[in-house]
A protein has these predicted regions:
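Cleavable N-terminal export/targeting peptides
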Residues: 1-27, 231-233
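Transmembrane beta-barrel domains of Gram-negative outer membranes and organellar outer membranes
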Residues: 21-233
């Protein structure tokens, strides 16, 4: 077994949550990344009235302060399945989050939707600045401000988000947010995260809806998060 395969075995055999908390299942990002030379896997299913989405977003901190994410989704609609989204993203911490200190990070990414514009793959570039403020040892507030360049429309649209994480007890986090991702609708989402095995695996579930078209845009999600020990060279 070569070194690369050994690292893969190490990743999937010894997955363990470290001190960094990822944003999933919230759409509002946080000012955190995974530990140096470590990886994470975020996966979830989102079900709405007409479409079911299956997401997987593996990410690795390839150095000391550069998290790279490459992933996407599969959609099932009217009995037909297709690859719906691709995501390529880099994230770096500007100022780490600490008690009484707001954390800042910067995110640069590229999104592709193969179904748009007569099945031509369209690239949408985005820039986002997540900020995280620890209100106390239980509550953290996150804000996002960013912009997306829509290639086929030749214009830019703003993104924003506001979310909260409340540590209810040693196993449960309560989460909520409002956000707008370059659309005409503002959404809200709330749910919880639960440790299946403390410091090893966590599941989450959420409910999402739109203020503009309440009931028509509602969806539910369930997800699984795993993070690895350091194993990259």
């Amino acid at each position: 077994m070569n070194n690369f395969l050994k690292r893969l075995v190490l990743f999937f055999s010894f997955c363990v949550i470290n001190h960094a908390e990822a944003a999933r299942p919230m759409l509002t990002d946080d000012a955190r990344i995974v530990d140096p030379k470590s990886c994470q896997l975020e996966s979830w299913v989102r079900d709405s009235e007409h479409v079911t989405e299956y997401w997987a977003l593996p990410a690795c901190n390839v150095g000391e302060n550069l998290e790279v994410t490459i992933g996407g989704s599969l959609e099932s609609e009217s009995g037909q399945s297709s690859f719906a989204n691709e995501l390529y993203q880099m994230k770096s911490i500007i100022q780490p989050i600490a008690l009484n200190q707001t954390g800042f990070s910067i995110v640069l990414g590229n999104g592709r939707d193969p179904k748009r514009a007569m099945n031509k793959a369209i690239q949408d570039w985005f820039l986002n600045v997540p900020m995280s403020y620890p209100y106390n040892d239980r509550l953290v507030i996150h804000t996002n401000l960013g912009v997306t360049h829509f290639t086929d429309e030749h214009k830019e649209k703003m993104n924003w988000g506001l979310s909260s994480e409340y540590n209810y007890n040693e196993r449960v986090d309560l989460i909520s947010e409002v956000f707008n991702q370059s659309s005409n609708s503002t959404f809200f989402q709330f749910g919880l995260r639960y440790w299946l095995i403390k410091n090893r695996a966590q599941i989450d579930t959420t409910y999402m809806n739109s203020f503009n078209r309440f009931g028509e845009d509602q969806s539910f999600s369930v997800g699984l998060r795993l993070l690895s020990l350091p194993f990259l060279p």
